[in-house]
């Protein structure tokens, strides 16, 4: 595959400035797709798998204008141009009948759009977040879905040709203030539009009926105990709220952060100014040391207001997140009108509920990474695992080795996606992230891979390898055979210096060491390395059945684990491989390989170790949630369905003793080889991350059908707030 950087500047400029006119995307060479600024397609367009639409979205990352007017396409599929930030203008097919859900989500440079008269349906959130869209023309009478044109802050004019208002949802144009957008309709139809659902918003704020929150329909994760007092008087929430800390002179002073979080949450939901001088409802925050778990809390709603008690500030915070969902209710509006009197007693099933993101493959800008944290907290996820290095890039500043980010923080492309990525995190940014996450009671766990998945470092320091070969940064998926050399003293010096700086940056008790996919065949490059052979002889490794290389990896790991555990007081973590015959005391292993979870759990029990459950069939969120869902890649992917994630049993059927003595937590992984924008990370994560949160939190979780009912309110709230998620469930 040709790389963009190998093309001359003249070729880039000439190719980019010329419009590409073809029947379909297969008529364009990869470099033409990567550099096309203008596209015109005239043939029959495919919509499934590695389709014409997938290629336009993912491979034509510089394209600004697209003309599909003469294309043979009746369906614009779901997510067709999802978060394609460079797109400024598109002419839709003349024969188009449907526009899928989130088809133009967050196309924030799109400035105008005309919906042809042939279109019969516009899906939910189809144009949500197109903040530069100023002109919208609808020529026919399509049915318009929920939040289809929501959050269009730049919209100035909407023109319609139909005298009969197209059927719309009350939320279709959410965010438009009455009188702020010029609505041009056929003469004589003004009154019809003023009365029509969805369209009346252009003239006056829509009236939505009063709602009393029903916690049985809106809470995720579901609390362990929820008792709603039927018949008791409900509390009107649209009044003054007074936030009170029960023990200001003692333990209560540690709740300053939770007070600020409560104030922000009430302001966002209710809009009222919290004023302690006015009579109103009380929100009492308190510490209850009698609760068993550090994250446990109780929440009581009575005639005076809300009382939240936690074993620690973490418990109080999770109680606030539960209150936020109660105030959200059905999600039809920012806040319900009233809440019932109730009692909640809650505690987590697992101590760690983690998401892993992968900025090594696709860099996540720092502000976008920060923004991911509050959304996690809404569902009581409490750890964010950062996969900071891999074969494709090195993303964390190491002051001892500035060359790592100077030379290895640029990724030329990945497989058929020839989109360049660059960027890294400074140490100050990571400290800021840690402090920010702490406000949401989320732990930041860094990962540095070893001995495999280290090509980015090897490209800078070839002396880290057995044969000291300089290799380029990897631009494909898969496994590299270039590994760190355990027989080389510089390997230990390098890793020691890197982990020294990481230990200073990240206060977490945990550091992840990688350990997976070290070559294919595994560790093979150590077999003929003179330094590795000398080390084997020195430490008494005599086997020749390839187990000797795993023993050598154990030697390397033992040294780094001892350093982390004894010098920096960190608990090492690593991805479990079935050839690990010994798990060092105190370590946490990750059961990740699809179909091999049973072996990983047995090894944890045998070694009296703790284990994080993240098997691919339940927890790989980079996989599509359903067949045909993003990411549609050219080589195909397995499916991890929402139901599969929800069905995860953290104990894996091994009973209470395993859960108590060996289970560490549950984790969802977001490997980013095929995730091209920050918005796509949310899309791949949710709603599966919510299902994972409930699997990890709720001891006796309800049925999957019950979860889907409760998910409806969450989905509406996410659309209202402009958060993307997969709707393929």
Regions found by a protein language model. Name each.
Residues 37-47, 62-75, 85-98, 108-121, ...:
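Structural signature of tandem-repeat unit edges
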Residues 572-578, 582-729:
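Flexible, acidic glycine-rich loops studded with aromatic residues
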Residues 291-510, 526, 559, 667-672:
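Feature activates predominantly on carbohydrate-active enzymes
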Residues 209-351, 572-576, 713-729:
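Acidic, contiguous N-terminal accessory segments
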């Amino acid at each position: 595959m040709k790389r963009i950087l190998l093309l001359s500047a003249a070729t880039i400029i000439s190719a980019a400035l010329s419009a590409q006119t073809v029947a379909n995307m297969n008529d364009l060479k990869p470099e033409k797709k990567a550099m096309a600024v203008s596209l015109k397609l005239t043939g029959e367009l495919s919509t499934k798998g590695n389709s014409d639409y997938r290629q336009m979205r993912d491979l034509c990352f510089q394209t600004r204008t697209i003309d599909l007017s003469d294309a043979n396409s009746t369906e614009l599929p779901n997510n067709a141009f999802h978060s394609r930030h460079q797109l400024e203008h598109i002419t839709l097919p003349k024969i188009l009948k449907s526009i899928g859900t989130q088809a133009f989500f967050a196309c924030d440079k799109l400035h105008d759009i005309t919906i042809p008269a042939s279109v019969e349906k516009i899906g939910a959130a189809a144009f949500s977040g197109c903040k530069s869209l100023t002109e919208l023309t609808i020529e026919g009478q399509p049915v318009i879905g929920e939040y289809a044109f929501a959050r269009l802050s730049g919209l100035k004019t909407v023109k319609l040709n139909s005298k009969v208002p197209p059927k719309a949802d009350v939320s279709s144009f959410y965010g438009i203030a009455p009188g702020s957008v010029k609505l041009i309709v056929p003469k004589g139809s003004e009154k019809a539009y003023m009365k029509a659902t969805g369209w009346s918003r252009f003239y006056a704020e829509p009236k939505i009926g009063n709602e009393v929150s029903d916690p049985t329909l809106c809470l995720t994760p579901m609390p362990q105990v929820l008792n709603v007092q039927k018949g008791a008087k409900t509390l009107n929430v649209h009044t003054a709220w007074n936030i009170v800390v029960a023990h200001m002179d003692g333990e209560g002073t540690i709740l300053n952060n939770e007070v600020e979080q409560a104030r922000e949450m009430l302001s966002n939901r209710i809009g009222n100014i919290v004023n302690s001088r006015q009579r109103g409802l009380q929100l009492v925050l308190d510490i209850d040391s009698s609760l068993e778990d550090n994250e446990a809390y109780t929440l009581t709603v009575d005639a005076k207001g809300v009382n939240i008690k936690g074993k620690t500030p973490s418990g109080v915070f999770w109680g606030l997140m539960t209150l936020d969902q109660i105030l959200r209710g059905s999600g039809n509006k920012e806040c319900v009108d009233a809440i019932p009197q109730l009692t909640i007693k809650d505690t987590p099933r697992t101590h760690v509920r983690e998401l892993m993101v992968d900025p090594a493959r696709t860099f996540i800008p720092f502000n976008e990474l920060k923004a991911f944290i509050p959304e996690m907290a809404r569902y009581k996820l409490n750890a964010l695992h950062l996969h900071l290095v891999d074969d494709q890039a090195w993303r964390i500043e190491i002051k001892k080795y500035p060359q790592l980010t100077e030379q290895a923080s640029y990724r030329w492309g990945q497989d058929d996606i020839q989109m360049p990525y660059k960027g890294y995190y400074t140490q100050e940014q990571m400290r800021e992230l840690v402090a920010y996450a702490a406000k949401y009671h989320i732990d930041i766990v860094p990962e540095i891979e070893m001995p495999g998945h280290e090509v980015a470092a090897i490209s800078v320091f070839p002396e880290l390898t057995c044969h000291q070969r300089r290799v380029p940064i990897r631009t494909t998926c898969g496994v590299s055979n270039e590994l760190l050399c355990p027989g080389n003293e510089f390997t230990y010096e390098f890793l020691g210096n890197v982990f020294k700086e990481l230990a200073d940056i990240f206060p977490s008790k945990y550091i992840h060491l990688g350990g997976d996919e070290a070559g294919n065949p595994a560790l093979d490059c150590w077999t003929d390395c003179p330094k590795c052979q000398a080390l084997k002889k020195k430490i008494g490794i005599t086997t020749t059945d390839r187990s000797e290389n795993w023993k050598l990896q154990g030697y390397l790991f033992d040294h780094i684990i001892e350093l982390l555990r004894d010098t920096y007081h960190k608990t090492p973590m690593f991805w479990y491989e079935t050839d690990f015959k010994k798990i060092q005391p105190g370590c946490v292993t990750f059961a990740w390989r699809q179909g091999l979870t049973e072996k990983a759990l047995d090894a944890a029990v045998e070694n009296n170790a703790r284990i994080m459950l993240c098997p691919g069939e339940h927890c790989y969120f980079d996989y599509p949630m359903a067949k045909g869902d993003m990411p549609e890649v050219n080589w195909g992917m397995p499916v991890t369905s929402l139901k599969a994630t929800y069905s995860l049993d953290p104990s894996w059927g091994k009973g209470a003793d395993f859960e108590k003595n060996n289970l560490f937590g549950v984790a969802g992984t977001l490997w980013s080889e095929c995730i091209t924008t920050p918005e796509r990370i949310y899309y791949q994560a949710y709603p599966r991350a919510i299902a994972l949160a409930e699997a990890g939190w709720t001891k006796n979780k309800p049925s999957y059908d019950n979860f889907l009912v409760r998910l409806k309110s969450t989905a509406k709230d996410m659309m209202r707030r402009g958060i993307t998620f997969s709707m393929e469930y």
